[in-house]
Amino acid sequence: MGAYRYMQELWRKKQSDVMRFLLRVRCWQYRQLSNLHRAPRPTRPDKARRLGYKAKQGYVVYRVRVRRGGRKRPVPKGATYGKPVHHGVNQIKFARSLQSTAEERAGRHCGALRVLNSYWVGEDSTYKFFEVILVDTFHKAIRRNPDTQWITKAVHKHREMRGLTSAGKKSRGLGKGHKFHLTIGGSRRAAWKRRNTLQLHRYR
């Protein structure tokens, strides 16, 4: 096994003494820093490389801190102005994951960069910490490489805002495996529409 394989196995056993100590110390360190800051290098190089990171010019890693828990509806004094069925304020669950939120915040802060992917690096009772891989699409090392030219196209601007990253697709119900089999037709809305539309073919 290569070195990255050993690192992968370490991260799989998060309850081991080594990882429990490491994660505890790192969470303390991350709490002292601002909620969005640039990391000098990936905390998990094995995971970052699997998600497309390369240790060369044009790649940047940002660490983002996101507060855990549900989403409270931002209304003044709980006044939602509507029918009682929509009066909920506190027990609201956000449609997207905290990882997707972290990607959005990093993409908003670094407007000239493109969000490639992200991964979990730690959590405590209050926060979750993610590292977001961003790409500088104006750098020659990215533009001249056939493997990374795809992200330089204008259609990939702010992919994190439109649910095109891995974390974003997950909350849209898109992916492979038994969890995503029901989303057939490109989106949940398309799947629902097809199931609820009566089609009477001429020859049936």
Swiss-Prot record:
It is found in: Cytoplasm. GO terms for biological process: cytoplasmic translation. It comes from Epinephelus coioides. InterPro entries: Rbsml_eL15_core_dom_sf, Ribosomal_eL15, Ribosomal_eL15_CS, Ribosomal_uL23/eL15/eS24_sf. It comes from the Eukaryota. GO terms for cellular component: cytosolic large ribosomal subunit. The keyword Ribosomal protein applies. Belongs to the eukaryotic ribosomal protein eL15 family. This is Large ribosomal subunit protein eL15. Keywords: Cytoplasm, Ribonucleoprotein, Ribosomal protein. GO terms for molecular function: RNA binding; structural constituent of ribosome. Component of the large ribosomal subunit. Component of the large ribosomal subunit. The ribosome is a large ribonucleoprotein complex responsible for the synthesis of proteins in the cell. Its main location: cytoplasm. Pfam families: Ribosomal_L15e. The keyword Acyltransferase does not apply.
